[in-house]
Amino acid sequence: MKILAANAQADSSNTEARQSLLFSQSPIPNAESRLLVAGVDEAGRGPLAGPVAVAAVVFDPNKPRINGLDDSKQLTAERREQLYARIVDRALAWSVVLIDSEEIDRINIYQATMLGMRRAVEGVAHVAGFARIDGNRVPKGLPCPAEALIGGDALDRAIMAASIVAKVTRDRLMHELHAQHPEYRFDQHKGYSTPMHLAALQTHGPCPQHRRSFAPVRLALEGREQGSAAIGDPEQLQVAQLVAPL
């Protein structure tokens, strides 16, 4: 696990005010609330390779509203990059945490995602009094009150921003990993279980960036260890793809 990036633009003269917000008893902030809300989302739970990225974003209420925000999955790569630049420029605070494939295999993808969410919120907790998290679970041990919001990446602007920051960060890293392992074409599929990726697993077996606890990777590895000419049957890999963790 590592915190890839963190930025805070809050000024220290507001320390007392921020502390009073942080310890507010209001359970869920509304439009009238003075709480600064961190939106939290992840990218990369489902892929067979690479890290899971989790971002937290707190908007600066004194900066212009960012138009065009949406769930990162609904945006083109070019549009995500454009919005990413605006988000990190106008956010009061933001953070991104990467949990690598080794840690994912050690504690499982669910726990890795929860860990990433907790660390991402900790990265903005000096300004955020509340966290709103995409999904149906709130991680334990957060430094501030929080709620889970199913479908939040299509409903809440701060979560939309977090989804974009997480996605852009992870995609950039997968391009870097492609340079190290070009045979897998991580730049094309970003580690997801596409036919291209499954074919590369058959031919080359897994690399250190692959998640060995995921069924298609495990099947490919077992095939190589058994010395088979072909690493598993293509139909078996397709079936394994369907049961890989989401």
Curated annotation (Swiss-Prot):
Protein keywords: Cytoplasm, Endonuclease, Hydrolase, Manganese, Metal-binding, Nuclease
Cofactor, free-text remark: Manganese or magnesium. Binds 1 divalent metal ion per monomer in the absence of substrate. May bind a second metal ion after substrate binding.
Major subcellular location class: cytoplasm
Function description: Endonuclease that specifically degrades the RNA of RNA-DNA hybrids.
CDD domains: RNase_HII_bacteria_HII_like
GO biological process: DNA replication, removal of RNA primer; mismatch repair
Positions of the RNase H type-2 domain: 35-226
GO CC annotations on file: cytoplasm; ribonuclease H2 complex
Binding, a divalent metal cation: D41, E42, D134
Similarity comment: family membership: Belongs to the RNase HII family.
Annotated protein name in UniProt: Ribonuclease HII
Annotated catalysed reactions: Endonucleolytic cleavage to 5'-phosphomonoester
GO molecular function, one term: manganese ion binding
Compartments reported by the entry: Cytoplasm
Co-factor(s): Mn(2+); Mg(2+)
EC number(s) stated in the UniProt entry for this protein: 3.1.26.4
Keyword Heme: no
